């Protein structure tokens, strides 16, 4: 809601405190395992789009902005199609301080935990990238901020490490993955949004006609539950091939509900992905599917599986 740099800096300073505390908890819990952290991604309407009069009045007291001014600012931020609007890396490019604040919180938290003997491996993930230049710009902010944090803490580069990667959730990023990979140390296919953008299908609004489409055999299943392997799956394979053309050992995975769907998981294994990420309750299913995929692959190599 801030309408100038000073107001924005003040708000970011407050947010950083909460984020740093959360990251410390995450790093401690992981006990030395890698932590992939996606930079802020949700569209603004998820925070302020449905504020009623009482909420505006309460917010007015907290931030010292009048209710009419809050209403005016909300109207100025309104978007007709927020899921494809000012979010993800677009927000970070418009307001680099938003990205810088998150990086400060991540790395300062990493240092706090490392001081107590726990290894920390932050993987900073830039969301909603469509152009390689977007990732390049955000990586510049991340690296510059990291240098400032190290200087402030009196650390060498080797004493506070991190990697930078990107979500592949826009078809253009998958198609131009060879260029995007020049600035990435890992890819993570965000298959929820890649399905939306690849099929032109809203995850929130398609439930009214998906059953009809399945009855009419337009779709064999719900593409948000099981990956559309012939369409969206081709974008995944294209992205894997392009990324590894540039960097042969590029780490690639997926995140989203498809990571817990057995058929989708087997497809990802065949496509050469290194890992899948899914909701905690789906992990046993994902592990079983990966084991089955590996056994099927070995069987095919020996000619035992048709």
What spans do the regions from the language model cover?
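Conserved alpha/beta-domain cores
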Residues: 1-306
């Amino acid at each position: 809601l801030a309408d100038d740099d000073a107001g924005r800096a003040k708000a970011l300073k407050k947010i950083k405190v909460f984020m740093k505390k959360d990251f410390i908890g995450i790093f401690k819990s992981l006990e030395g395992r890698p932590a992939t952290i996606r930079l802020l991604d949700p569209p603004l309407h998820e925070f302020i789009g449905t504020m009623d009069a009482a909420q505006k009045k309460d917010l007015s007291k907290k931030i010292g902005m009048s209710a009419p001014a809050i209403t005016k600012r909300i109207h100025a931020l309104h978007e007709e199609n927020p899921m494809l609007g000012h979010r993800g890396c677009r927000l970070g490019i418009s307001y680099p301080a938003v990205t810088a604040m998150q990086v400060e919180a991540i790395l300062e938290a990493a240092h706090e935990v490392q001081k107590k003997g726990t290894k920390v491996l932050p993987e900073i993930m830039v969301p909603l990238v469509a152009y390689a230049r977007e990732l390049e710009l955000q990586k510049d902010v991340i690296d510059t901020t990291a240098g400032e944090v190290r200087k402030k803490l009196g650390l060498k580069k080797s004493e506070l490490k991190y990697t930078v990667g990107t979500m592949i959730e826009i078809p253009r990023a998958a198609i131009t993955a060879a260029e995007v990979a020049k600035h990435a140390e890992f890819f993570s296919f965000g298959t929820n949004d890649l399905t939306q953008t690849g099929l032109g299908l809203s995850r929130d609004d398609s439930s009214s006609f998906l059953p009809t489409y399945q009855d009419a055999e337009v779709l064999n299943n719900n593409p948000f539950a099981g990956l559309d392997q012939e369409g969206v799956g081709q974008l995944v394979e294209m992205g894997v091939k392009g990324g590894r053309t540039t960097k042969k050992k590029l780490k690639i995975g997926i995140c989203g509900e498809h990571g817990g769907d057995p058929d989708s998981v087997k497809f990802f294994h065949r496509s050469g992905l290194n890992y899948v990420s899914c909701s905690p309750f789906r992990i046993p299913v994902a592990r079983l599917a990966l084991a089955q995929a590996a056994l099927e692959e070995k069987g095919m190599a020996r000619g035992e599986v048709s």
